[in-house]
Swiss-Prot record:
Family, similarity comment: Belongs to the aromatic amine dehydrogenase heavy chain family.
Organism for this UniProt entry: Paracoccus denitrificans
GO molecular function, one term: methylamine dehydrogenase (amicyanin) activity
Protein name, UniProt field: Methylamine dehydrogenase heavy chain
Subcellular location, record wording: Periplasm
Bridged cysteine pairs (disulfide): C212-C227
GO cellular component, one term: periplasmic space
Length: 417
């Protein structure tokens, strides 16, 4: 359900339904007594919306709730997934990155994995619910949403509860480039990839795969996975039969650890995958085969010796048109690679040249970039429950969106640039 820009109808409905008219009047009176500048400096966005709604109630204005539609999606729409620290019921916030405001929310179950079509035409997630909220019979499902009404257009149950419930890992659930098929990962009882026909609104089958992880689609019937031996597996599948699986060369040794959340541009066919030390592997998958590009170093030898390492949850982002890599870094002890970072480096993906190093001003866990000509850099602080929106060229913080649930972790954008 789409929300109005300032949430006023929802506040009005809540206040009326709970019989809090007197409280609303008192809130309005209190707000009027306080100096405007002081009130605005101290209150959150939610408090400001409540104050405005209470003032409208006191004036007898428009006290009927309304259901609004969100604006049509554009390249600057951003989705923030809040798994709420492994809660059974979760939310995804739909945000207008240009205006810096929440325009809607989508409910999910336990550890949903969101995806969005490159043209912005739909949002989907693979999710899990239980018959008694946090316990009982488990049901896995895929849900598809309209990007304007934010109402579900498909609800597809997955047989035998096959989803891999380990965390909100991007690229454990993926869309094929044509947006017609959703692929999801199964870990137990054996590695497999599930195939869901979004057009037909039906689960199709499970594909047996090697002991490999992540799903990087390159065609409607082909995807790559990363394997334990340091190679990529290419998986070609049809409507039936055994998938055809081939392996690439080993591109990194087993003791050179890659972060859990790489960046992948389907339109460019570019996979960007940093190591724990800041070495960045790049693989060109645009031809349908894997071409390994020269690795680049995000950090200097002196910085690495001084304890600088990548860190965060969603640590790396890639801008297709500019061919730039964005990576969160900070000084940290070894094995602290999932802790938040205070700085970000920008690299030319082709040459490895460092173009910028930004002080983010906050402890940042996850990043992403809009794919338009003058991109926005999205920086999410799980601790602050806030999305900070920066100019990706200068690093300047432009605006922020706060009160994003309990523990927001993952930023998803559409490549509409």
């Amino acid at each position: 359900m789409a929300l109005p820009p300032n949430f006023m109808p929802l506040f009005r409905a809540s206040l009326i339904g709970l019989g809090l008219g007197c409280s609303a009047l008192a809130l309005a009176a209190s707000a009027q007594d306080a100096p405007e500048a002081e009130t605005q400096a101290q209150e959150t966005q939610g408090q400001a919306a409540a104050r405005a709604a209470a003032a409208d109630l006191a004036a007898g204005q428009d006290d009927e709730p309304r259901i609004l539609e969100a604006p049509a999606p554009d390249a600057r729409r951003v989705y923030v997934n809040d798994p709420a620290h492994f809660a059974a019921v979760t939310q995804q916030f739909v945000i207008d990155g240009e205006a810096g405001r929440v325009i809607g929310m989508i409910d999910g179950g336990f550890l949903p994995n969101p995806v969005v079509a490159d043209d912005g035409s739909f949002i989907a997630h693979a999710s899990t619910v239980f018959s008694r909220i946090a316990r009982g019979e488990r049901t896995d499902y895929v849900e598809v949403f309209d990007p304007v009404t934010l109402l579900p257009t498909a609800d597809i149950e997955l047989p035998d509860a096959p989803r891999f419930l380990v965390g909100t890992y991007p690229w454990m659930t993926s869309l094929t480039p044509d947006g017609k098929t959703l692929l999801f990962y199964q870990f137990s009882p054996a590695p497999a990839v599930g195939v869901v026909d979004l057009e037909g609104k039906a689960f199709k089958r499970m594909l047996d795969v090697p002991d490999c992880y992540h799903i990087f689609p390159t065609a409607p019937d082909t995807f790559f996975m990363h394997c334990r031996d340091g190679s990529l597996a290419k998986v070609a599948f049809g409507t039936e039969g055994t998938p055809e699986i081939t392996h690439t060369e080993v591109f990194h040794p087993e003791d050179e650890f890659l972060i859990n959340h790489p960046a992948y541009s389907q339109k460019a066919g570019r996979l960007v995958w940093p190591t724990y030390t800041g070495k960045i592997h790049q693989i060109d998958l645009s031809s349908g085969d894997a071409k390994f590009l020269p690795a680049v170093e995000a950090l200097t030898e002196a910085e690495r010796a001084d304890g600088w390492r990548p860190g965060g949850w969603q640590q790396v982002a890639y801008h297709r048109a500019l061919d730039r890599i964005y990576l969160l870094v900070d000084q940290r002890d070894e094995w602290r690679h999932k802790t938040a970072s205070r700085l970000l480096v920008v690299l030319d993906a082709k040459t490895g040249e460092r173009l910028a190093k930004f002080e983010m001003g906050h402890e940042i866990d996850s990043i992403n970039v809009s794919q338009d000509e003058k991109p926005l850099l999205y920086a999410l602080s799980t601790g602050d429950k806030t999305l900070y929106i920066h100019d990706a060229e200068s690093g300047e913080e432009l605006r922020s969106v706060n009160q994003l649930g309990h523990g927001p972790q993952v930023i998803t954008t559409a490549d509409m640039g």
